[in-house]
Curated annotation (Swiss-Prot):
The keyword Flavoprotein belongs to this UniProt entry's keyword annotation: no
A Pfam family the protein falls into: Aldedh
Physiological role: Catalyzes the NADPH-dependent reduction of L-glutamate 5-phosphate into L-glutamate 5-semialdehyde and phosphate. The product spontaneously undergoes cyclization to form 1-pyrroline-5-carboxylate.
Places the protein is found: Cytoplasm
Name this protein carries in UniProt: Gamma-glutamyl phosphate reductase
Pathway the protein takes part in: Amino-acid biosynthesis; L-proline biosynthesis; L-glutamate 5-semialdehyde from L-glutamate: step 2/2
Reaction equations catalysed: L-glutamate 5-semialdehyde + phosphate + NADP(+) = L-glutamyl 5-phosphate + NADPH + H(+)
InterPro entries: Ald_DH/histidinol_DH (IPR016161), Ald_DH_C (IPR016163), Ald_DH_N (IPR016162), Aldehyde_DH_dom (IPR015590), Glu-5-SA_DH (IPR012134), GPR_dom (IPR000965)
Native organism: Prochlorococcus marinus (strain MIT 9515)
GO biological process, one term: L-proline biosynthetic process
Length: 436
């Protein structure tokens, strides 16, 4: 068995799959907008037609995972209900409704008479996506890849093998009815292959890891392929002193309990000292009734929080019904805490003071900064991107939920009429550098 810290060389079977995928991605890049939209609709149709097989496969995966005793957070992500499947299918169709990301002219400039420069969006090529547990990610990633004219190599967690294979089989059946080569989607099922993927520099143009902190950091450190991703989702919500308590409670609850295993769920709640007694008096019974374990600093414990926090709690991504609570003296202390412990994913403030909100949103350097709304909105589907291939917490773009715009690059096209640099050096021709 291959250890997670071993990166083997790809064997001939994997190299053959990678070459087929590379060739299919080239063909996909040459398809037009209508062909790619039609392919997505056929993929969605096929998922609907094969939904029973997919749900049954997920049931088998879930049973095995329960027996193995995997964490509640992973079990929650693994579960693919009929509702989740339908949302994934809807997401594929919505991706088809989005504007064509390819061939968009970003720059058009006359360099000289008859010498025209354009910068246009083009596919990245082949995406390598490694993810844990969430089988619905297969639908999101595959649809975005095809819409942007890319091929994709997928490796999900072994706990979702049956589900992932059923979904990819359905997607390929859909592609077989389209003008897109079904080899544009490739699923790997062994850990050895997923690690060997890191050595496929000649075939893969971008790796997108979606999983644990350990997995993402390992991939970032062990491949020469560019990596897009985030290693942690330590999100914060700060409740200011000028606040509507009902709004604060509603948003705090949604940010934590709506789906605690999500990377955009809050792990730490910061509360201004003047509002903390009134807020916690209302909040603690509701959190308790929703089975949320509350861990707080000494001030929070004095106000009724059951367990005392230690330093590690402020830098822990629980992905579970556990919430750290800290009482702060003012907005500045809240901002300082977030600046120290945030993973730069999503952080929010609840306040009626616009000046305080603006200060918070300006000084917090996260991919998403929210005012008076749940951190759970940090999602490509909710942003109207159709779906997301992942979330990036890096400062350079793409940043935040990555949809279609993060799966294209650009290329410079220069058309002339026999122009030579020597003509400009000699003064025979001149640059006009005129925007068109």
């Amino acid at each position: 068995m291959t250890d997670i810290f071993e990166v083997p060389s790809p064997d001939n079977n994997l190299l053959d799959k990678a070459e087929q995928l590379r060739l299919a991605s080239i063909k996909t890049s040459q398809t037009n907008n209508n062909e790619r939209i039609r392919a997505l609709n056929l993929m969605a149709d096929s998922l609907e037609k094969n939904s029973k097989e997919i749900i049954d496969s997920n049931f088998e995966d879930y049973k095995k995972a329960e027996i193995k005793g995997i964490s509640k957070a992973l079990l929650s992500r693994l579960k693919l209900s009929k509702e989740k499947l339908n949302l994934g299918i809807e997401g594929i169709r919505k991706v088809g409704d989005l504007s064509d990301p390819l061939g968009q002219i970003q720059i058009k400039k006359e360099l000289s008479k008859g010498l025209i420069l354009e910068r246009k969006t083009v596919p990245i090529g082949v995406l390598g996506v490694i993810f844990e547990s969430r089988p619905d990610a297969v639908m999101q990633i595959s649809s975005l890849a095809i819409r942007a004219g890319n091929g994709v190599m997928l490796k999900g967690g072994s706990e979702a093998n049956f589900t992932n294979q059923a979904i990819v089989s359905a997607l390929k059946k859909g592609l077989q009815k389209s003008n897109i080569d079904d080899n544009a989607i490739c699923l790997l099922t062994s850990r050895k292959d997923s690690m060997a993927m890191l050595n496929l520099e000649k075939f893969i143009n971008l790796i997108i890891p979606r999983g644990s902190n350990e997995l993402v950091k390992f991939i970032q450190e062990n491949t020469g392929i560019p990596v897009l991703g985030h290693a942690d989702g330590i999100c914060h919500l700060y409740i200011d002193d000028e606040v509507n308590l009902d709004i604060a409670l509603k948003v705090a609850l949604d940010s934590k309990i709506q789906y605690p295993a999500a990377c955009n769920a809050i792990e730490t709640l910061l509360i201004h000292k003047s509002i903390a007694p009134a807020f916690l008096k209302k909040a603690i019974p509701i959190f308790n009734s929703n089975n949320v374990k509350l861990i707080g600093d000494k001030k929070a414990v004095k106000l009724g929080v059951a367990f005392e926090a230690n330093y590690e709690d402020w830098q822990t991504e629980y992905l579970d019904l556990i919430l750290s609570i800290k009482i702060v003296d003012d907005l500045e202390e809240g901002i300082a805490h977030i600046q120290k412990f945030s993973s730069k994913h999503t952080d929010g403030i609840i306040t009626e003071n616009i000046s305080n909100a603006n200060k918070f949103m300006s000084e917090i350097d996260s991919a998403g900064v929210f005012h008076n709304c749940s951190t759970r909105f940090a999602d490509g589907f909710r942003y109207g991107f159709g779906a997301e291939v992942g979330i990036s917490t890096q400062t350079l773009p793409p940043r935040g939920p990555v949809g279609l715009e993060g799966l294209v690059t650009y290329k410079y096209f220069l058309r002339g009429e026999g122009h030579s640099v020597d003509d400009f050096s000699s003064g025979k021709s001149i640059y006009t550098h005129k925007d068109l």
